[in-house]
Amino acid sequence: YFLMGFQLFASGSYEIFNFPVDARNLALHNSASAYDGILLNNNPASLSKRANGNTYSYFYLPANIHFTGFQNVHNSSSGVRANKISFMSYGAIIDGETEKKSYAYDILLESGVKKEIKNLTSVGLSAGYLFSSIAGYKSQLLYSNIGIRSRMLRKRLGVGLSLENIGFLLKSYTDV
């Protein structure tokens, strides 16, 4: 019953949050990982200290769906900082009655930080903004992800915990 409640809650989410941004996340079915990663993902505490630079992503899916993403990760003595922008276009939507064409898309901006504590535990926080438009109806929200990760047994075993998509809806699709 507990797991079913979470599945029902997640079914009303924005699709761009569930979309994997690289091949590794696609293989893991977009699940969070306690291992180091070079991209800002579900658990911001899993950002690698070795990550540095820019990453570009582009996916083309059936039904004319396009995903484009850009991430910048910077490593400094105070921790790891990451910024990302993502755009997902769901293509044209044609009204069956009026034959009017409209579009659906999501734009996501996110920034995150990770701090390592005694080379054993990492704490991460990310915050973002999402703008979504479907056939002229628009929605906006602010969200955050909080994560913690610990490495044990000479860094062979990783354990992580993340709270994801903690959000505040600024404007619903149905607000006029």
Question: Which residue ranges define each predicted feature?
Answer:
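Subset of outer-membrane beta-barrel
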Residues: 9-176
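Hydrophobic h-region of N-terminal signal peptides that target proteins for export
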Residues: 2-10
